[in-house]
Amino acid sequence: MIVALPPLMVAEKPPMALVLGLESSCDETAVALVDNDGNIISSHLATQEILHRPYGGVVPEIAARAHVERLEPLVRKVLNESGKNLSEIDAIAATAGPGLIGGVMVGFVTGKALSLACKKPLIAINHLEGHALTPRLADKTLSFPYLLLLISGGHCQILLVKNVGEYRRLATTIDDAGGEAFDKTAKILGLGFPGGPAVEREALNGDPMAVPLPRPLIKSKEPHFSFAGLKTAVLRAYQSGIYKRHDIAASFQQAVIDCLVNRSEKALKKIEGENIQINAFVIAGGMAANQAIRPALTDLAEAHNLPLIAPPPSLCTDNGAMIAWAGVERFRLGMIDNLESPARARWPLDPHAEKARGAGVKA
């Protein structure tokens, strides 16, 4: 079933859009200004890596406080660089979830305040929709519908993207997300934070076939993901003392790639079996920045006579441009929200999707 995310208020379709986007759902504070044609007028980001590195992961309280300190200066920086003032902006788009609720609230309340003070429309953006629509920012020829592999630190899903606000979830993780498994593997191997890039770098010098690691759910008929068992296998391989660190990293990364390809293959066959025509196979989310993942998915797409569309790495990880662009997409369709819109820790793109069998299914 295709389920639309309902707007709280519908306005007349505007001819043009210049949207300010605010992102604060995890550990990146980001602001950007994007126009109707997808031109990124200005985009700036303040990372919190140094703040969280001593803890080996993101600390929600620290993240929220950092967003408070950094968001307003970033807004001023983007406006100054663009030569625009708030009166010239058509709408304010802010992440309203899902994510770490403290950080989400900081950004969304700031968006509401700007909307109220400047009398500009507010657009509440689902962070996942920001990722889902970013490929259309990166490739202006991409049209609906397309199949999306959304891979990040908090989510691992396969979605049929039919239109703005219309999503059908075909697969999700039944436990850990792929990016979370990368972070945990980096911690096990002592590679530091953030874990994804650290594992990717370490894997460059390793043998991807050196360590026998499982491919969870590889024989399952449904295209759902599972990475908890793989993470445990990495821990055991490391504790055995038999394998070199770079070989474990390379073998882990290859196992993840094999799972992504296998699950995506099943999803592609599923929609082909339903005679659904799509225009592209698309990847997005922080893990999509991993350069080792792309070649295998390119081969898969080509085997199904589809192009693989992947944003540049700078648009894969959390950024303000993706939120501003999602705001542009919604604003052009008249999808406007009001000041009573809530911030949400969880906000599935397809709230009516059947729950996958397994514990801890993520939105």
From Swiss-Prot:
Catalysed transformations (reactions): L-threonylcarbamoyladenylate + adenosine(37) in tRNA = N(6)-L-threonylcarbamoyladenosine(37) in tRNA + AMP + H(+)
Any one biological process term the GO annotation gives: tRNA threonylcarbamoyladenosine modification
Cofactor remark: Binds 1 Fe(2+) ion per subunit.
Biological role: Required for the formation of a threonylcarbamoyl group on adenosine at position 37 (t(6)A37) in tRNAs that read codons beginning with adenine. Is involved in the transfer of the threonylcarbamoyl moiety of threonylcarbamoyl-AMP (TC-AMP) to the N6 group of A37, together with TsaE and TsaB. TsaD likely plays a direct catalytic role in this reaction.
Species, as recorded: Zymomonas mobilis subsp. mobilis (strain ATCC 31821 / ZM4 / CP4)
Any one GO molecular-function label of the UniProt entry: N(6)-L-threonylcarbamoyladenine synthase activity
Protein name, UniProt field: tRNA N6-adenosine threonylcarbamoyltransferase
Pfam family, any one: TsaD
Sites where the protein binds Fe cation: 127, 131, 318
